């Protein structure tokens, strides 16, 4: 089986490094599916799930957005925040979502709403991943 090397790197650590059969990432234009020998590509990623598929199964990683660099034999994903799906905290994500929604409701014109919207999108993406994982376990 042909493989491609994938590295998922956050601002603080290397979260994943290994050979995979394919990787899926949430690009700004839609989900990317990357297989071995893929054409070179550079794209912006939005908050969401990165899935790496190996002969041992699928591993999911939450990213807060970032950049993906694809070469025929190597994929590198850079993100400010990356968390293994099993380590996502639903209560923290719910709190962050509530804080962001309240901040948007109480925002004045002089405040930077775009930063608040980014925080809201990140918390929603985390909650969607948690729900997806929960539904697979049932």
Curated annotation (Swiss-Prot):
GO molecular function annotation: ATP binding; proton-transporting ATP synthase activity, rotational mechanism
Name of a matching Pfam family: ATP-synt_DE
Keyword line: ATP synthesis, Cell inner membrane, Cell membrane, CF(1), Hydrogen ion transport, Ion transport, Membrane, Transport
Record's keyword annotation contains Nucleotide-binding: no
UniProt subcellular location: Cell inner membrane
Any Gene Ontology CC annotation: proton-transporting ATP synthase complex
Matches recorded under InterPro entries: ATP_F1_dsu/esu_C_sf, ATP_synth_F1_dsu/esu, ATP_synth_F1_dsu/esu_N, ATP_synth_F1_esu_C, ATPsynth_dsu/esu_N
Membrane topology of this protein: Peripheral membrane protein
Main location per the UniProt record: membrane
Similarity comment: family membership: Belongs to the ATPase epsilon chain family.
Subunit structure: F-type ATPases have 2 components, CF(1) - the catalytic core - and CF(0) - the membrane proton channel. CF(1) has five subunits: alpha(3), beta(3), gamma(1), delta(1), epsilon(1). CF(0) has three main subunits: a, b and c.
Function recorded in the entry: Produces ATP from ADP in the presence of a proton gradient across the membrane.
Record-given protein name: ATP synthase epsilon chain
Organism: Ruthia magnifica subsp. Calyptogena magnifica
The gene coding this protein: atpC
């Amino acid at each position: 089986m042909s493989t491609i090397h994938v590295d998922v790197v956050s601002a603080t650590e290397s979260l994943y490094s290994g050979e995979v059969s394919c990787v899926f990432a949430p690009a700004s234009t839609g989900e990317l599916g990357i297989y071995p020998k893929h054409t070179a590509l550079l794209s912006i990623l939005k908050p969401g799930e990165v899935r790496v598929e190996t002969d041992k199964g699928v591993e999911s990683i939450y990213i807060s957005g970032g950049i993906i660099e694809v070469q025929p034999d190597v994929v590198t994903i850079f993100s400010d925040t990356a968390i293994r799906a099993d380590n996502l905290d639903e209560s923290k994500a719910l709190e962050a979502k509530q804080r962001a929604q309240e901040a948007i409701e109480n925002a004045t014109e002089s405040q930077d709403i775009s930063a608040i919207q980014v925080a809201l999108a990140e918390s929603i993406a985390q909650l969607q991943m948690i729900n997806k994982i929960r539904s697979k376990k049932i």
